[in-house]
From Swiss-Prot:
Coiled coil: none
Binding locations of [4Fe-4S] cluster 2: 151, 154, 157, 201
InterPro entries, alphabetized: 2Fe-2S_ferredoxin-like_sf, 2Fe-2S_ferredoxin-type, Asp_de-COase-like_dom_sf, MoPterin_dinucl-bd_dom, Mopterin_OxRdtase, Mopterin_OxRdtase_4Fe-4S_dom, NADH_UbQ_OxRdtase_75kDa_su_CS, NADH_UbQ_OxRdtase_ferredoxin
Residues of the 4Fe-4S His(Cys)3-ligated-type domain: 83-122
Record lineage: Bacteria, Pseudomonadati, Pseudomonadota, Gammaproteobacteria, Enterobacterales
Gene3D superfamilies xref list: 2.40.40.20, 3.10.20.740, 3.30.200.210, 3.40.50.740
Quaternary context: Composed of 13 different subunits. Subunits NuoCD, E, F, and G constitute the peripheral sector of the complex.
A GO biological-process term: aerobic respiration
Location of the 2Fe-2S ferredoxin-type domain: 2-83
Listed name of the protein: NADH-quinone oxidoreductase subunit G
Major localisation: cytoplasm
């Protein structure tokens, strides 16, 4: 710690910080542009000037840039010194000479760091009356709009995109006061994290194009704290709504998980919530048609049919909340509850959970991944299956440069010096996958092989680290030399990290990862292990347990069950569509509860219109076992009284109560959570994931809307001049209104939107943190459900045999895509242009055998259908395999590991 003196007052600060960071952490306001907590200091904008004095007696002082000055013990500075204030105002005036006076039409208006800093410096009058510099804007793809004339040359964008996210297609061109930030030519930004430019840019150069299509100001949107639903990582988000539509998603700061950044799937993939074809009212089949029901009719009709059924089974979902899955389990009984995922996937999920709970290895939070000094990724294409983890791995690899700089006593925030000292030095990263990955550019070595051979590599590494681990026979000398390099790197690391998961489709890959981690722990390393699952609540569903989807289908096929309730699950993604349809056709009652229109609704007798994550509350459990709560953003019935969309748990409990002819006793979310805790002790921690509905600050609920929210009384005037009452939230501590507490200093961790007096942009998160870039002042939201066990597991011993190609037979290797593999985000219209066209990848040798070239269309039979796809040649794919894009149209993820036997050139 260090003692500094600011304008005559004494403060205790972190001596490792610079003065800007230290003062902001104290709650003092210093304007800045080029500095960012995640990017460090370069001193480019000269905006953060303060007066520094030699000692208490010095009255003259000198101007210094606070972001480039260490917060040393005994430092004396003044923020309010007149010369410093005039200097800061003049810097803004210089920046404004070329900045357009277009705030009323700029999409950043009201959410703009430049506006905030201009007001903070007191610059309110323009003296410049000459021609402004102008630029041509670029088309940067479907996600981001480009308005280069607003640029103030702070360099944040390229520092984030190139230095932090390792993007290669955004740069700065020109010199002096005429520089251009963009691509060499028009085109879509290639980085999976390009959307963060929207929040990194302090002006309106980079803005959210998906928001532009249905634009409104930040102060006119309704927000709620939420969790990204697009993968298993559980990033914290702030969705904004207006007129019953999600308009944008912003990053919600969580110092333990995603801190400042999201991936593009999480930021832009929300379009499925706004689809017009979503089920909005319950419907029941009458012949070939469906008739619309109200809620009471739906409950009575379903109850009447279920009473006549001899056995009702429930099929849950990894994309439904803990509460919804539990409500289904209560409706049908624990013995009749099935997870809705394939047997193989369920086995892998249970194994991953076993490793996390009983393996004796620490599982780091997302932010902690950045602190590891050697990383082995086994079997996961992390950028496509858990993108935010990939960004964290990139920071971990860059830790080598920080380590080298620290040895020379260079401060952690001196990023230019760190990059200069590091000269692209990296901590070791080793990756295995069926083909190339997006982490190959920073990897020390990438092993491209079938999953069995990837697992064998992992087992061999574990054995080399610890002789008591099972040995692997038949390792080739060339591969053994690579194993020796990996072993040396992992054994020499202080904090090695092993990353694996369920997406490779192999139990042995997960077992190999666990063995490597155990072997490293035995050598005294501070080892961590991270498992990546497939869906937002895969881990929660795994903890809850239940039978596999195949077992559920068997119950229907044999007639042992004659009614089935399917919860938020397109079963065609998890099993053969022919088998699913045949099994559902045998059931006299098929009830579907979902917020999306899925293929199985064609077999449904009753459809209950569920609420999406934006219209409901619930709990999900991420890949590290962290329970996190998401909250309802808006009530769709407020805008259309005909809409009947309820949380799935509310539908299912209402049906359960109707069946038993009793009053509904889960009248609010807390009641469901209490029931979960009572029945499933391992989920007891979810109660602490967020405060209950009685939480108040000074007697007030928390506001979902900024206090400047406008137009509420006119919002429905085209429907009726009689203003309805605002929706009443009985489930949570939030209110659907601007009337409520939104103080940044209030004792809360669940923050719907970032705003503080004088800070309207995302930089307002500074005001919510215990120190800038650290944790939230009153703790990061969420709670871990299990910690590292004391004992650990024995070594896994089932080393697989080598992959052997078979003539006339090809094994399907899984290829995942950030844009296209996820069930929900692939429905977003804006994603259509970023999704690859379906393809089949072939090794050059296999392509030659078949007599086909790149672009040739080949066909194969699957599930009773003939599938025809264009060929793409993949040098890294081992012969005897074909690669298919998992999760895309007609290519269910359950196909991974299956075999094709009739692959041939398609008939023209």
């Amino acid at each position: 710690m260090a003692t500094i003196h600011v304008d005559g007052k004494e403060y205790e600060v972190n001596g490792a910080d610079n003065l800007l960071e230290a003062c902001l952490s104290l709650g003092l306001d210093i304007p800045y542009f080029c500095w960012h907590p995640a990017l460090g200091s370069v001193g480019a904008c000269r905006q953060c000037a303060v007066k520094q004095y030699q000692n208490a007696e010095d009255t003259r002082g000198r101007l210094v840039m606070s972001c480039m000055t260490p917060a040393s013990d005994g430092t004396f500075i003044s923020i309010d010194d007149e010369e410093a204030k005039q200097f800061r105002e003049s810097v803004v005036e210089w920046l404004m000479t070329n900045h357009p006076h277009d705030c009323p039409v700029c999409e950043e208006g009201g959410n703009c760091h430049l506006q905030d800093m201009t007001v903070m410096t007191g610059h309110s009058f323009r003296r410049y009356r000459f021609t402004k510099r102008t630029h041509r804007n670029q088309d940067l793809g479907p996600f981001i709009s480009h308005e280069m004339n607003r640029c103030i040359a702070c360099y944040r964008c390229v520092r984030y995109y190139k230095d932090y996210a390792d993007g290669t297609d955004l740069g700065v061109y020109g010199a002096h006061d005429n520089v251009y930030f963009g691509r060499p030519e028009d085109g879509t930004l290639e980085s999976e994290f390009s959307g963060n430019l929207v929040e990194i840019c302090p002006t309106g150069v980079f803005t959210d194009k998906t928001h532009s299509e249905r634009y409104n100001r930040k102060w006119d949107m309704q927000f709620a704290p939420s969790i990204c639903q697009q993968c298993s990582i559980g990033c914290n988000i702030s969705p904004g709504e207006r007129y019953g539509e999600l308009r944008r998603i912003e990053n919600r700061y969580n110092g333990t998980v995603n801190h400042y950044f999201l991936c593009d799937r999480g930021r832009f993939g929300y379009g499925y919530v706004n689809l017009k074809d979503r089920p909005r009212q319950p419907v029941q089949r009458r012949g070939d048609d469906f008739i619309t029901l109200n809620a009471e009719q739906a409950m009575q009709g379903a109850a009447d049919i279920l009473r006549q059924s001899k056995k009702v089974i429930g099929i849950g979902s990894p994309r439904a909340s803990v509460e919804s899955n539990f409500a289904l389990r209560e409706l049908v009984g624990e013995e009749n509850f099935y997870t809705g995922i394939a047997h193989g996937e369920q086995e892998r999920l249970q194994l991953a959970l076993k490793v996390l709970r009983e393996g004796g290895i620490y599982t780091p939070a997302l932010r902690e991944i950045e602190s590891y000094d050697a990383v082995l990724v086994l079997g996961e294409d992390v950028t496509q299956t858990g993108a935010r983890v990939a960004l964290a791995v990139r920071q971990a690899v860059k830790g080598k440069a920080r380590e080298m700089a620290a040895a020379q006593k260079v401060a952690d925030w001196q990023i230019a010096a760190i990059l200069n000292i590091g000269q692209r030095a990296k901590h070791p990263l080793f990756v295995t996958n069926v083909d190339d990955t997006r982490l190959d550019d920073i990897a020390a070595w990438t092993y491209r092989a079938p999953v069995e051979d990837q697992a064998r590599l992992g087992f061999a590494i574990a054995h080399a680290l610890d002789n008591s681990a099972p040995a692997v026979d038949g390792i080739e000398p060339e591969l053994q030399s690579k194993i020796d390099v990996i072993v040396q790197a992992l054994a020499g690391a202080k904090k090695p990290l092993i990353i694996s998961g369920t997406n490779a489709g192999s139990l042995e890959v997960i077992q190999a990862a666990a063995n490597v981690a155990k072997a490293l722990k035995g050598r005294g390393a501070d080892v961590g292990i991270t498992m990546i699952a497939r869906s937002v609540n895969s881990m929660g569903l795994g903890i809850m347990g239940g039978g596999s989807l195949e077992e559920a289908l068997t119950e229907l096929e044999t007639g042992r069950a004659d009614a089935v309730v399917v919860l938020e699950n397109d079963l065609h993604r998890h099993a053969s569509a022919i088998r699913v349809n045949a099994a559902l056709a045998k059931a006299p009652l098929v009830m579907v509860v979902d917020h999306q229109r899925t293929a199985i609704m064609e077999n449904a007798h009753l459809v209950l219109s569920a609420a999406s994550f934006a219209e409901s509350d619930g709990t999900v459990i991420n890949n590290e076992g962290r329970a996190q709560r998401f909250f309802q953003v808006y009530d769709p019935a407020y805008y259309d009284s005909k809409t009947v969309m309820l949380e799935s748990w509310r539908w299912l409990h209402s049906l359960h109560s109707t069946l038993l002819s009793r009053e509904v006793d889960w009248t609010q979310l807390d009641h469901v959570i209490d029931a979960v805790v009572a029945k499933i002790p391992e989920l007891a921690g979810i109660k602490d994931a967020a405060p209950d509905a009685t939480f108040r600050i000074r007697g007030q609920k928390l506001a979902r809307e900024p206090h400047r929210y406008s137009g509420r009384t006119a919002m429905r005037a085209n429907i009726s001049v009689h203003e309805p009452r605002q929706p009443q939230d009985i489930d949570t501590m939030f209110t659907f209104s601007m009337e409520g507490n939104n103080q940044p200093t209030a004792h809360r961790s669940q923050v719907p939107f970032a705003w503080a007096p004088g800070w309207n942009s995302p930089q307002a998160w500074n005001k919510f943190q215990d120190e800038v870039g650290g944790k939230l002042r009153f703790g990061d939201p969420g709670v871990r459900l299990f910690e590292t066990s004391e004992n650990g597991l024995d070594y896994f011993t089932s080393v697989p045999a080598r992959f052997q190609p078979q003539d006339g037979k090809w094994r399907i290797a899984p290829y995942y895509h950030l844009f296209g593999s996820d069930e929900l985000s692939q429905r977003a219209p804006v994603f259509q242009s970023r999704m690859p066209q379906p393809y089949i990848k072939l090794n050059p040798a296999d392509a030659a055998k078949l007599g086909v070239n790149a672009g040739t269309r080949v066909s194969f039979s699957y599930d009773g259908n003939t599938v025809t796809l264009p060929v793409e040649i993949a040098e890294g794919l081992t012969a005897g395999q074909v690669g298919l894009p998992m999760g895309m149209s007609g290519i269910a993820p359950v196909l991974a590991g299956a075999h094709l036997e009739d692959l041939k050139e398609a008939q023209q």
